[in-house]
Amino acid sequence: MNKIHIFSSPRSGTHYLESLINRMLDISIVPTPFEERNAFNIDTKELSNKINEFNSIDSRVCKTHPNWLFPYDTSVEQFKYLREPDSDMLPLIRQFTEENDYTLGVIRLNIVDVTLSFALAYHNFRLTGDGTGSFRPPYNNNTVTISMEDFVENCNKILAIYEVMIAQKEIKCDKIIYYEDLTFDSSDAKLIGLNTVRTIESSVKQAKSKKETIANYDELREYAIKFFSVHQWSMKITDGVITDMDLSNLKRRK
């Protein structure tokens, strides 16, 4: 496996997994042309050229999230009920995926924890404007208060991302794992399907508990549990944790 793609729900350990694969296989971590929605600010011809350049790399590990590939512009509702990307994006997604040797799907079942983590990361991102202390280490561990208005939008966005992840049919995964099964040490190499396993020191740098860094944590968590028990159709969610979901569109047929 020389070209590995991680397709993941948000806040699900992709930074760690990229680092693990990088150290196990000695292949570079390379951002895709879709990184952080940059792709939606350039025309399709330029994006196609960037994808061709990316695909020419001999070996690499990369990651994407559903909202990078399947844009929703400014309307969460438009994204929530979208069943496939717009016609301009479809060929570009296929152009990207056809060169991957191996695609790993990663899903975090505790969707409430995902939403709280995403809300905190996005809140800190907007405070700094440069990404510091937001979506990647080093984390900003200052205690903040997140407005309920912003959090409601975050809940809608996370639900939309999960729904599109399992509804889309363009990304097929050779293996699907759950964030909750990761041990964050060398043994995860076997879990994600690597044949090469080395004993390496964990690169994980834990952030402080969300209960400590979000001043109104209890209020937000209570809202999220109620939200996800009502506002969803494609998954069974109990106390904020997904207990059943249809992954047939994600699985690659052997």
Regions found by a protein language model. Give the residues of each.
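PAPS-dependent sulfotransferase catalytic core
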Residues: M1-H65, I200
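PAPS-dependent sulfotransferases, especially Golgi type II membrane carbohydrate sulfotransferases
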Residues: K3, R136-K169, L182-K254
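Short alpha-helical segments used as structural interaction elements across diverse proteins
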Residues: S8, I57-R60, G105, K205-A207, ...
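A periodicity- and composition-biased signal for non-globular, repetitive helical segments
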Residues: L17, L69, K211-I214
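A general secondary-structure boundary signal
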Residues: S28-F34, N100, I176-Y178, D239, ...
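Intrinsic-disorder-associated interaction segments
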Residues: F40-T44, L82, D86, V144, ...
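PAPS-dependent sulfotransferase catalytic domain
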Residues: P66-D174, Y179-V197
